[in-house]
A protein has these predicted regions:
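C-terminal, low-complexity/hydrophilic appendages and adjacent surface loops
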Residues: 37-38, 44-76
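Beta-strand elements within well-structured catalytic alpha/beta cores of enzymes
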Residues: 43, 71-72, 94, 98, ...
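Short, structured active-site-proximal loop/turn typified by the sulfatase FGly-forming signature C/S-X-P-X-R
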Residues: 139-188, 233-237
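Second-shell loop/turn segments in exported
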Residues: 57-60, 80-88, 101, 116-119, ...
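His/Asp/Glu-rich, glycine-adjacent segments
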Residues: 2-7, 12-19, 38, 45-46, ...
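Active-site-proximal N-terminal segment of extracellular/periplasmic enzymes that hydrolyze or transfer
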Residues: 108-113, 117-160
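Secreted, luminal/periplasmic, and some membrane-associated catalytic domains
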Residues: 1-49, 133, 146-148, 156, ...
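Short, solvent-exposed turn/loop segments enriched in Gly/Ser/Thr/Pro and often Arg
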Residues: 110-115, 161-181, 236-246, 349-351, ...
Length: 466
């Protein structure tokens, strides 16, 4: 990592500047880049600077604090009780590890089986559950070490790969979830970020329309489900379509069926009936107002607020965590996941830790409160699995870390909208035109038609940014 006090460089050449980065950093960027879909210019802010604003920090980049995530395996009789281990690991290792647990055949991919965590017990667990705490990388867990006692217990009683990383950059939700599901990195599976260059040349949003057509390869859920003749129950409850990359493709692929998809979004749980199914009782699932009222009373003052913030109009508080946990447990119970002889798969994402990191910052007490709420939800899920399913395995990870407050690091935000304006100003672009089609968390999608008109090259723009 470059020292924070080195603010000037001897060269503006993008090749020279890129080669000055470590091999580890360059490898992460290479894994996360697709020449057809990614930004045309990739930016790597010098630590502790970051993309975003003072108010809304960004978490996309190759640096260690954004890359290191928990990767904890737990399952009575299925996962070895060895605590923290130093073995290298990545989220792409989840793909072959789930297949190994379930005794299924999947296509060989980039990840490796986390065999040191598995006991090799006979048979297969009745349920394998993958839980993602969105944005809760090791930096966040280290910041609030007392907020997650249930996860800490899983670390002690299972196997925790404390050096695990997401392995690619940008460290962003759609890309990492697809890496979890497919066992390969974005340069292979094709999901490079929230925004990407579509085949028609326009900048589009990943998983638009709640389909997985953007993903070039199948997931472990697809393959394991078909390996068992579509007999397993395969389900996911998450927050947004960005999380679908780790799930199945449903009936969108040959041989697939209508697996169960439930996305909470903004308070109404919905799915995509074209390729998936969703239990009807989830559509108007009750309890959000009840959870909001309970949280409202917790500070002794009934004013509709938590820590001074509206509860129901936002999604950055424990009420939403508890509501998701209630709905998820209802789905597990009523659909009978793990309650017959056919092994099942269930996946979930708790988004609130990430939302709080963006809205308030990972160093603020709101983050501690939401992280603890997610840990309590984890405890509730484990209680149910222990009582009813008994033979199960849980894998918990995160999709990226978060950016600490610039007040603590001395970092300076790099606003991508401002970069777009700066480029146009520097190259004297006529009013109403732009050299950029769009910007993303890590770079610029260039407008090649305008560049040709003004006789400006990629290299010139990159040198200006350097």
């Amino acid at each position: 990592m470059l020292a924070a006090d080195k603010r000037t460089f001897s060269s503006e050449d993008p090749v020279a500047r890129g080669c000055a980065l470590s091999k580890e950093i360059l490898l992460r960027i290479w894994r996360g880049h697709d020449p057809k879909r990614s930004e045309d210019i990739t930016m790597v802010p010098q630590y502790p600077n970051y993309s975003g604003t003072f108010v809304v920090p960004n978490h996309s980049g190759p640096w260690k604090y954004l890359q290191q995530v928990p990767l904890v395996l737990y399952g009575p009789g299925r996962v070895a009780e060895q605590g923290q281990v130093q073995d290298p690991a990545s989220v792409v290792d989840i793909y072959p590890t789930v297949a190994q647990l379930m005794g299924a055949s999947v296509a060989p991919r980039g990840g490796r089986v986390l065999s040191s965590a598995l006991t090799g017990a006979a048979g297969v667990p009745k349920l394998v559950m993958v839980i993602v705490w969105d944005g809760a990388g090791r930096d966040m867990l280290d910041r609030w070490p007392d907020a997650w006692p249930n996860l800490a217990r899983l670390e002690r009683q299972g196997t925790s790969y404390v050096n695990a990383t997401i392995g690619s950059s940008p460290s962003i939700t759609p890309a990492t979830h697809s890496s979890i599901g497919t066992g390969v990195y974005p340069h292979v599976h094709g999901v490079v970020g929230i925004k990407y260059r579509a085949s028609n040349g326009k900048v589009a949003n990943a998983f638009s329309g709640r389909t997985t057509a953007i993903e070039r390869v199948t997931t472990f859920s697809d393959q394991i489900d078909q390996d068992y003749g579509n007999a397993p129950k395969v389900g996911m409850m998450a927050w947004r379509s960005w999380h679908m990359g780790m799930f199945s493709h449903g009936s969108e692929i040959p041989g697939g069926d209508h697996d169960q998809l439930a996305l909470i979004g903004h308070g109404k749980i919905t799915g995509n009936p074209t390729y998936y199914s969703m239990p009807s009782y989830l559509e108007h699932f009750p309890g959000l107002k009840k959870e909001g009222a309970k949280l409202d009373r917790a500070d002794g003052k009934v004013d509709g607020k938590w820590m001074g913030h509206d509860i129901l109009s936002t999604h950055d508080n424990p009420a939403w965590v508890n509501y998701e946990a209630d709905a998820e447990l209802a789905m597990l119970k009523r659909e009978g996941y793990g309650l017959d002889d056919v092994p099942d798969i269930f996946m979930t994402n708790f988004k609130m830790t990430d939302i709080v990191g963006h809205v308030f910052g990972m160093d603020q007490p709101e983050e501690q409160g939401v992280l603890h709420a997610q840990d309590v939800a984890l405890g509730r899920i484990l209680d149910y699995l222990n009582k009813k399913v008994k033979d199960y395995a849980v894998i918990l990870t995160a999709d990226h870390g978060h950016t600490p407050s610039p007040k603590l690091t001395g970092g300076w935000p790099i606003a991508n909208g401002e970069i777009k304006r700066d480029i146009d100003t520097h190259f004297h672009v006529p009013s109403g035109e732009s050299l950029s089609d769009d910007t993303s968390a890590v770079g610029v999608f260039l407008n090649y038609a305008e560049m040709k008109k003004l006789n400006i090259s990629e290299d010139e723009i990159a040198r200006f940014l350097n």
